[in-house]
Amino acid sequence: MSVLYVIDSDVLITFERTQPRDIYTSLWDRFEALLRDGEAVVPREALTELERGTDDLAAWVKKTGAVFDADDEVIAVVAQISTRYPGWVRLAKNAADPFIIATAKVLGAVVVTNEHSRNSATLDVNLRIPQVAAEFGVTVVATNDLFRQLGWRF
């Protein structure tokens, strides 16, 4: 199965806060299967963001085997993004974002994130994944759109 989705850490963090694994087991089981079956990946840089948390979300992602390590092709796209938007990446805040977009571009996958675009006059420092992804030809969907695409009902 080819990778269809690249998951932003904010999706998993929001799930953990609003749909805890011990209560929403069917949601988490389906999401785990999506990752385990190779239909979705989490870039290592997004995993690093998860590791800053106090829960076991990073360990859960590692267990699925869905952590994606950037290769030279991904690094080249990250460099293009950084050149185009030099003020966008702030290490403590969004260091994973260009890797999420670059991974999706290289794999021909869709980014899943909870971020929304800002207006076109937004300064680089305030850009969001959907704006940058659009410029690089990468499709972005929200979590509920992912569920609809997969036909998931809860």
Regions from the PLM with identified roles:
Residues 43-45, 70-71, 143:
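Conserved beta-strand termini and adjacent loop/short-helix elements that scaffold enzyme active sites
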Residues 1-42, 49-62:
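Short, well-structured N-terminal submotif of metal-dependent ribonuclease cores
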Residues 62, 66-68:
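Short, contiguous, well-structured surface segments enriched in hydrophobic/aromatic residues
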Residues 48-49, 73-79, 137, 146-151:
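A short acidic, often aromatic-flanked loop/helix-cap motif at beta-alpha or helix-coil junctions
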Residues 72-131:
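Active-site neighborhoods of divalent-metal-dependent phosphate/nucleic-acid chemistry enzymes
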Residues 39, 65, 105-108, 137:
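Residue-level detector of structured alpha->beta connecting loops
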Residues 2-4, 16, 117-154:
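Acidic, PIN/NYN-like endoribonuclease modules and their adjacent C-terminal/linker elements
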